[in-house]
């Protein structure tokens, strides 16, 4: 039997892992200690969804989830990355791959949650983009560097295009695939907006 709730939780966990990996790897590259990497990985993992929920004035997702699994997933993922930092040290591009997965998952998830709360397409698109991009924005601000989304990358625009498709096709999977595909293409071929 198909359990939709289990699928949603699984996809959310994959997104949390991807963004926590991205944040912790960025911390490793800045020579942060394990606590710094955990804080950065966790902030990256939950940052976008937290901003979305605060703006929508709904309960913050990780404060109400079962046994704080969101925080536990982010902390554990960050510790794993810190402990395996030598494996990832020479693979700088891997941050972008994890980030692409997180962006696609959380853009769609943020859109769906916002549309459920507001029934407004415009608000849902903005909240989807914020959910997808917010964790990376928090990560970059914590590291005192220009946020990734402001550096000419096809990042927020990938989220926007995927979410526009979601409005017209009503297929979260297709929107996810489009966002991920755009990010993979831009990483692979070094495509920029400027």
Question: Where are each of the predicted segments found?
Answer:
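C-terminal transmembrane helix-loop-helix hairpin of multi-pass membrane proteins
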Residues: 119-133, 137-194
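Cytoplasmic-side transmembrane-helix entry/capping segments in multi-pass membrane proteins
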Residues: 35-43, 67-72, 92-103, 127, ...
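Structural signature of hydrophobic alpha-helical transmembrane segments
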Residues: 4-16, 61-76, 120-132
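Helix-coil boundary and interhelical linker segments in multi-pass alpha-helical membrane proteins
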Residues: 1-7, 54-64, 109-123, 167-173
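N-terminal topogenic module of multi-pass integral membrane proteins
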Residues: 1-57
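Ordered, amphipathic secondary-structure segments that act as subunit-interaction surfaces
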Residues: 70-113
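C-terminal ends of transmembrane helices
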Residues: 20-30, 79-92, 137-147, 184-194
């Amino acid at each position: 039997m198909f359990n939709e709730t289990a699928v949603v939780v699984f996809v959310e966990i994959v997104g949390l892992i991807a963004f926590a990996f991205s944040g912790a790897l960025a911390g490793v590259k800045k020579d942060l200690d394990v606590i710094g990497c955990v804080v950065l990985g966790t902030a990256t993992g939950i940052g976008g969804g937290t901003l979305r929920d605060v703006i929508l004035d709904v309960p913050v997702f990780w404060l109400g989830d079962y046994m704080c699994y969101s925080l536990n997933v982010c902390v554990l993922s960050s510790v794993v990355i810190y402990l395996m930092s030598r494996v990832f040290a020479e693979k700088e591009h891997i941050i972008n791959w994890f980030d692409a997965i997180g962006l696609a998952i959380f853009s769609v998830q943020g859109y769906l949650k916002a549309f459920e709360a507001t029934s407004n397409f415009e608000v849902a698109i903005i909240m989807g983009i914020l959910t997808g991009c917010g964790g990376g924005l928090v990560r970059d601000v914590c590291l005192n560097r220009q946020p990734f989304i402001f550096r000419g990358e096809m990042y927020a625009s990938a989220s926007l295009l995927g979410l526009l498709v979601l409005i017209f096709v009503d297929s979260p999977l297709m929107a996810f695939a489009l966002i991920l595909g755009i990010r993979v293409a831009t990483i692979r071929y070094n495509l920029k907006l400027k």
